[in-house]
């Protein structure tokens, strides 16, 4: 059995601004209990009890998505007895998208991209992520993922489901995984 969505972090290797912000309550609640390293060894112990034998790491808001991807890839390479692939963050609206995806595709464990469309109405309005589905660059980026045989992991709030369905129907070549359906 494969765990299709989990996170790892090492606060000494990769910077996660949202995770390291002390005293900031998020849409999912108080992050204090998870403001510590969560590494593959601990994850595997938890996952094996449930029958998992492989997993997919989903990006978790690193300030440097490439550093996070390279760190996860090094873990995958160092643990061949635990098949581990990953979904990374890449800004699908970026003018450097082709170059960014070219770089990510040099990292062997990468299978797809997650750019969060919806977390909570309040946070999405502040960050502008609630406008991504209206962006032609974002829609083009979704299509480009499929052209490169990369998947898209969709995290959204309920009010965005219909709009997301319309965007995704315009890129039928892109395989999409629905994560945090309805968020969180």
Which residue ranges define each predicted feature?
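Structural preference for beta-strand elements that scaffold enzyme active sites
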Residues: 1-3, 53-56, 83-87, 110-114, ...
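An N-terminally biased module of ancient metal coordination in phosphate/nucleic-acid-related enzymes
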Residues: 1-73
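Short aromatic-enriched loop/helix-cap "lid" or pocket-rim segments at secondary-structure transitions
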Residues: 12-19, 98-100, 125-126
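Acidic-and-aromatic substrate-binding clefts and catalytic sites of carbohydrate-active enzymes
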Residues: 34, 61-67, 90-98, 155-162, ...
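Acidic (Asp/Glu)-rich catalytic clusters
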Residues: 43-51, 70-82, 99-111, 135-136, ...
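Glycine-rich phosphate-binding "P-loop"
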Residues: 60-61, 115-133
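A short, structured active-site edge motif that brings together acidic residues
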Residues: 83-93, 97, 114-120
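Catalytic pocket-lining loop regions of alpha/beta-barrel enzymes
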Residues: 129-184
